[in-house]
Each structure stands twice: as C-alpha cells, then as structure tokens.
Amino acid sequence: MKNVGLRIDVDTWRGTRDGMPRLLELLAAQQIQATFFFSVGPDNMGRHLWRLAKPQFLLKMLRSRAASLYGWDILLAGTAWPGRKIGQGLAAQIRAAAADHEVGLHAWDHFAWQTWAGVWSERQLTEQIRLARDALTAIIERPVTCSAVAGWRADDRVVQAKQPFDFHYNSDCRGTEPFRPLLANGAFGAVQIPVTQPTFDEAIGQTTTRAGYNHFILDSIKADRGTPVYTIHAEVEGIALSGMFQELLSMAVAEGIRFCPLRELLPQDTAALPVGQVVRGEIPGREGWVGCQRLLK
C-alpha cells in the first residue's frame, strides 16, 4: 500500500456546515482518517470577487465553473453583510471532525490571510494565528498541534511567526517531501509537510477534464516519488463533487493507495529530514504567489 496524506481544507461557513459532514460520512464508509484544517473566524470569502479583474483568476473561475462548483452563498459571503464567524456558529460540526480525525488550524479570516499575509507585519501575522489558535483550542478542548495557512500564502516570515505556537508540524507550502525549515537565526522551525499534488481547481481545464479527473489524480499520486500529499476542499469535494470523491476513494483502495492523516507521514526522527526554506513562487493553475519548498544542500 502507498501512504498518501489526505488534507481537507474547510474554508467557509457552508463548507463547515454542509460539506464537511458529508466528507465525514464518505471517509467513515471507507475507514479512512484524514487531517482537517479549519477556518474559524469571519467568512468573508465573497470579497475575492475583486480578483476577477486579474485575468489568471478570471480564467480559473471560468475553467472550474465556479458558480456551480461553490454556490453563490460562498461566492458572495461577507460582501453585502459582515461575514459570519464560523467557529462561533458551527462549533459542534468542528468537534464532530475532531472526534475521529486530526484537526488543525487553517485561518482566522481566510480571505484576509490570502489577501494580506504577504504584506502584514510580524505582529499582524502573529495576531491572526493567535486568534485562530485560541478559537480552535476552545472548540476542540485540546491543544492545536498542526496548521496550514490559507491559500499556501507563506514565506520565511510566516514560518518564523508560527514558532511561538509550538505546532508539531505545519503544511504551509507546495513541494515534494517533509523538511526542516531553516530560520534566519540558524535554528530550525517546525517541520513542514508540503502538498505535492494539484487541487481540483488547479488541474481542471488545464491538464484534465472533470470526467477524467479521478484517473488523472490517481495516476499523479502513483507517479509521485516524494511523500504524496493531496488536498481537497469541503466546499468542493464535500458538496458539488461529493459523488466524484466517493468514487475516488473506492478507486484508490483498488489501486493500493491508503489515505492517512498528515501526522502519519512524519518519521520518528525528524532530525533526519532534509533542510530547506519556504520561499515565494508560482504553480500552474493558481493565481498569485504561494509558498514553495526550496531544499538546501
């Protein structure tokens, strides 16, 4: 069996209320555990609409048929009214995931992090992490041990800002294998477990079709020579594409692929992991910069 980290990002109110419970049902049916990363503050995701002025983002939205994929309540959330606080209103749903799966911190305000993390001061970065960590800790009633920034918007500043929170690992970047990020002072930050596989919205219309997506992503996972990590979203695979994801889980079992929480990808001795940095870069199918793994010799 090939172990593949299954990361599930839960970004919005609707994804937490509707998509995530459906994913719990699908995973339970196959006896699969995963890692859920939750946004717990205001759902302002609709404010991303201004990015339609950027050609690359507009093309992505058209390729993925965003209106039917996400629904208008997600696409307009936080525009004409203040965004609802997800953790405050949907704590029971988050606790349901934490009962059987690894749960980590995604964001306080997903939109704000994805939009402003690149220019925020260290104080602002730290405050956003603290708000989310405190809220999620109160909900699940145990320490939060892992995190993954919204939209993979991470660099060395973000890695440093997370140090005081003592996460066991972070999944903030795209890359090939777990590594130890080198800090400016010569010390090592918490281990990073990069995402290695494209997401549905990155691949669709560029390298595959909706009908061929499951075969495409399984072939990509089987060809992965690093430590494969695959990300899905509660707003997509838990709602509009839940049937397709159900088929993917069955196909994966038949092809010898075992999905698992990200923590199971860590070796007992993390000191043996390679050393690297989280730097800004670009990946096909995604608008704007993301954190990328750069290994150091």
Swiss-Prot record:
Instruction: Indicate whether Kinase appears among the record's keywords.
Output: no
* Keywords, ordered alphabetically: Antibiotic resistance, Hydrolase, Lipid A biosynthesis, Lipid biosynthesis, Lipid metabolism, Lipopolysaccharide biosynthesis
Gene3D superfamilies per the UniProt record, alphabetical: Glycoside hydrolase/deacetylase
- Example of a GO cellular component annotation carried by this entry: membrane
Q: Which residues form a coiled coil?
A: none
Known SUPFAM superfamilies for this protein?
Glycoside hydrolase/deacetylase
Q: Name one GO molecular function term.
A: hydrolase activity, acting on carbon-nitrogen (but not peptide) bonds, in linear amides
Which E.C. number(s) belong to this protein? 3.5.1.n3
Query: A GO term (biological process) for this protein?
Result: lipid A biosynthetic process
What EC class does the entry list? Answer: hydrolase
Q: Which PROSITE patterns match?
A: NODB
InterPro entries named in the record: ArnD, Glyco_hydro/deAcase_b/a-brl, NODB_dom, Polysacc_deacetylase_ArnD
* Listed pathway(s): Glycolipid biosynthesis; 4-amino-4-deoxy-alpha-L-arabinose undecaprenyl phosphate biosynthesis; 4-amino-4-deoxy-alpha-L-arabinose undecaprenyl phosphate from UDP-4-deoxy-4-formamido-beta-L-arabinose and undecaprenyl phosphate: step 2/2; Bacterial outer membrane biogenesis; lipopolysaccharide biosynthesis
Q: Does the keyword Metal-binding apply?
A: no
Q: What range(s) does the NodB homology domain occupy? A: 2-260
Q: Which reaction does it catalyse?
A: 4-deoxy-4-formamido-alpha-L-arabinopyranosyl di-trans,octa-cis-undecaprenyl phosphate + H2O = 4-amino-4-deoxy-alpha-L-arabinopyranosyl di-trans,octa-cis-undecaprenyl phosphate + formate
Among Pfam families, the record links this protein to:
Polysacc_deac_1
Matching entries from HAMAP family are given as: ArnD (MF_01870)
Please describe what this protein does: Catalyzes the deformylation of 4-deoxy-4-formamido-L-arabinose-phosphoundecaprenol to 4-amino-4-deoxy-L-arabinose-phosphoundecaprenol. The modified arabinose is attached to lipid A and is required for resistance to polymyxin and cationic antimicrobial peptides.
Provide the family line: Belongs to the polysaccharide deacetylase family. ArnD deformylase subfamily.
Tell me what this protein is called. Probable 4-deoxy-4-formamido-L-arabinose-phosphoundecaprenol deformylase ArnD
Q: Which organism is it from?
A: Sodalis glossinidius (strain morsitans)
Name of the gene this protein is made from: arnD
